[in-house]
Amino acid sequence: MQYTPFASDIELPFYIALASLKINHDKLDDSARKVLGLYELRPSDAPNASCRIQIHGNALTSDEVPSTYYRAEGMIKNVNTIEEYAKADKMGMLQQSGETIWNAINNGTIYSCPSLLSAFVILSYADLKKYKFHYWFAFPALHSDPSWTPLEEGCEGAQAHRLPSVESSALARSVQEWARVVDAPQRGFFLARRVRMRDDDTVSWKIASLSSYEDGFFKHAEFADCFTCFVDPSNYEEAPGWMLRNLLVLVKRRWGLTKVQILRYRDGPSPRDCGRSIVVTLRLKTSQLPDGGVKDDRMPKVTGWERNPSGKLTGRIVDLTEQLDPKRLADQSVDLNLKLMKWRISPNLDLEKIKGTKCLLLGAGTLGSYVARNLMAWGVRKITFVDNGSVSFSNPVRQPLFNFADCLDGGAKKAYRASQALSEIYPGVESVGHVLAVPMAGHPVLDAEKTKADFEVLKGLIDAHDVIILLMDTRESRWLPTVMGKAAGKIVMNAALGFDTFVVMRHGVTNNEHPEEELGCYFCNDVVAPMNSQKDQTLDQQCTVTRPGVAAIASALLVELLVSLLQHPLGAAAGAPQTPNNTQNDHPLGVIPHQIRGFLSTFENVSVVGRSYKCCSACSRPVIDEYKKNGWNFVQKALNEVGYVEELSGLKEVCHPPLSIA
């Protein structure tokens, strides 16, 4: 007897699901898990393309079997390294799977899950960096010893034959009615008893589960009317499907039979697919049974590893980069390193919170370029730029989002080009640029209508984002966003550069319960309000002259500080440790300083805590309250009237206290 081996047929979405499961759930756990296999009757397929076990995209999570499919019980072991895949005990895996079938036959549990007779195992390794999947299927088949063979020529029932069309149609109807009322694991294997009507020579069928054999389902019936059936996906006329091998072991071991009439059920639900089922009578090849007769307790030999398309006994490799849309590949790959952090190093890291954070970058120059790239590396998807400058020829070597072509024809607008560059790096990012001038303290309003329009756009952007990042060239340009961010309760991050120094900080948020613990802002150490720093400046004073590496260092620290802050349950309200050694063991990324001041001349970083100053020109309560109350009118007055902000905040009184009269 020749059998048609199962062939594996994996849908593309399954690989995506397996990769996602490995990255997000299993991580380093390579324990075997269940996987649902399906097979179906496909009469139109060529014989060599039939008998396929299909692995659908939901095979790892779903237990549902569509009505026209039949269930196969599978296990998958997805190992962690290619070396483990190569060195895995493949014979041991096959033997263990075969032993599961053998034990189920012996103890009778096979009757509750006959689909175990179509069991399979998968050994796999997913190379998630290159999106290559290595896998090898095994379809364990227990050998019958002695083997089964069709009856010799001349014996009654020797020839394999099809049922008459009337009987075949009646059988199909009976099987379909039975299948509707039994569980999915039962549908692939069953018993059929032909009942001949004495009055009119018609035939009807009784269908039952395999367990009914031991309840006397065939009692008093003629051998010719008793059929042990299995749904056969093989389209070969003389080579039944692979699962028959395990069914015959059950017939011999459990029922003690040496002769059986097998019905290869191949009739589909459509009338045009009826009449394809084949009946074959089998007997054990020799009457010389092993010691102990049919009840031989020794486990049979097991075979079943699948051959590759070249006929070699080895696994297969599928390269998804050749099949997936490049944008989808990018979506799957950009977060890979981040998700690997959760495997061992930081399992409590909340990547979704980082991914969903909307960041507004005020400044698209050197700092803005580096900060944007680091935000993308952490998985941030929403990045908005605000800048009113154009790309000059001196920019591309220091600002990695721009190139030489951006300098031509007067230079592209930095905000627009920066957002476009991010989309070129990763199409999944949502980035836009806005060209506008941020109203600056110390710079009187020359065009009230335009300045107000810029203010309204800036206000809308701040309201629409979670994090405001100050990366502008001048001190005074940071004043208004500091006020607006504090009033809106946003996370405000700030980075500023000197020649070989930098400061990176997070601004404090309002703390009504403990105002003495409120953290300060960029302006809390000032004793005067911001003024025009560009007036009467030489060229070296107009440009930001720094050691080239300072911007990259400061930008990286700013993003790392922001991400650490996002992981804290209090968010922007998180306190700052007084000393660097004051670690927070429950935080996935460690301490969250208030300020980091760096000195490249000594290659030192110092963490500093600065409290909110009650007379601060930007974050003091009088300034914030006045802004909330009067909005644009307050801004216009602050820009036009010299000394107004100092007087409102209390700085004027600090610098020039009233003389006491003796």
Curated annotation (Swiss-Prot):
It comes from the Eukaryota. It is found in: Cytoplasm; Preautophagosomal structure. Gene3D superfamilies: NAD(P)-binding Rossmann-like Domain (3.40.50.720), Ubiquitin-like modifier-activating enzyme ATG7 C-terminal domain (3.40.140.100), Ubiquitin-like modifier-activating enzyme ATG7 N-terminal domain (3.40.140.70). A motif (GXGXXG motif) lies at residues 363-368. One of its GO terms (cellular component) is phagophore assembly site. The active site is at C543 (glycyl thioester intermediate). One of its GO terms (molecular function) is Atg8 activating enzyme activity. Keywords: Autophagy, Cytoplasm, Protein transport, Transport, Ubl conjugation pathway. One of its GO terms (biological process) is protein modification by small protein conjugation. The keyword Transport applies. Belongs to the ATG7 family. Homodimer. NCBIfam families: E1_like_apg7. The GxGxxG motif is important for the function, possibly through binding with ATP. E1-like activating enzyme involved in the 2 ubiquitin-like systems required for cytoplasm to vacuole transport (Cvt) and autophagy. Activates atg12 for its conjugation with atg5 and atg8 for its conjugation with phosphatidylethanolamine. Both systems are needed for the atg8 association to Cvt vesicles and autophagosomes membranes. Autophagy is essential for maintenance of amino acid levels and protein synthesis under nitrogen starvation. This is Ubiquitin-like modifier-activating enzyme atg7.
